[in-house]
Amino acid sequence: MNEASRWRHALAQQLAPHYSANPKVMAVSLGGSVSLGCADRFSDIDLMVFWTAPPTEKERREIIKRARGRRGPRLPSKAEEGYWLEQFEVAGVVIDVRHVTVETTERIPVDVLERADPSLAKQQHLAALLSALPLSNPSVLTHWQHQAATYPYELSVAMIREHLLFHPAWEQEMLAERSDLLVLYESFCTVEQHILLVLMGLNRLYYSGFRWIDRLMGQMHIIPPNLAPRFKQVFGIASIDPLAGVYQLHELVQETFVLVETHVAAVDTRQARAWFQERRKHWEYVPDRLL
């Protein structure tokens, strides 16, 4: 754990008792870059608070007050799904809190692990649990981490089928030839995200977001060679020669197809390949007998 993570961890340990003092709170944990040990000067502190019954607005507000925090902007929450988000500051340090019911926390592994639900939001919850550090009642977190530790083959197949989806190659070639760079770069991001999602399924890693992707790729064993630098090179090459950047990215797509075909026989790539390789007819001149 680096120094930026250590002092944030210490502050989180000071904040946790304000939550665990409430009898409805079963456990408190620390997540994000701090629990991973790679926080930097921009990092906030991510807390997860697990409630046996939904917290009231008053309860959450009073905890922040006891912690001498200054409440931040109202964040989107979904009470019907069993979670509430909020943000506050302590001495200028931003604290992001995800309040979640125990019922929700115990339902998500059933959906993802037993029913192979590839929902990214649910996987993100499991990824957060696996990387979390306990701040109170550690046995509860350990139990959930043990549940989430085994990534099932069926989920791997579901993830690959869901995200092995690339628009026809000619679309990016068209954007490159037109020097329509804003849309082209946006499409680069979309394709790279889909590659990563497929690779997460191949490597049986829960989706945890698209931050710290070099760290994510470092956890993968089934991966195109030199993926991290090649991802970055796509944009660098395209800034000089857009079409060359497109071809570099398309090589990665083709290599991803090969990896799926090699390691997951249950996934039929033929339809996805055919769509990616589809070509549109070009018209340099007016077609014969059209006009």
Q: Where do the PLM segments sit?
A:
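Conserved NTP/Mg2+-binding pocket subregion across the NTase superfamily
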Residues: 3-4, 66-178
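Short aromatic-enriched loop/helix-cap "lid" or pocket-rim segments at secondary-structure transitions
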Residues: 40-42, 108-111, 212-213
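Short, solvent-exposed loop/turn segments at secondary-structure junctions
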Residues: 35, 102, 206-207
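Conserved nucleotidyltransferase catalytic core and NTase-mimicking acidic/glycine-rich helix/loop elements
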Residues: 142-291
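Short secondary-structure capping/turn segments at boundaries of alpha-helices and beta-strands
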Residues: 14-16, 31-36, 72-74, 83-85
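Hydrophobic, Leu/Ile/Phe/Ala-enriched alpha-helical segments that form helix-helix packing faces
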Residues: 15, 19, 64-71, 256, ...
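Helical scaffold of the NTase/Pol beta-like nucleotidyltransferase catalytic core
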Residues: 1-29
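Catalytic metal-binding acidic patch
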Residues: 31-68, 80, 88, 92-99
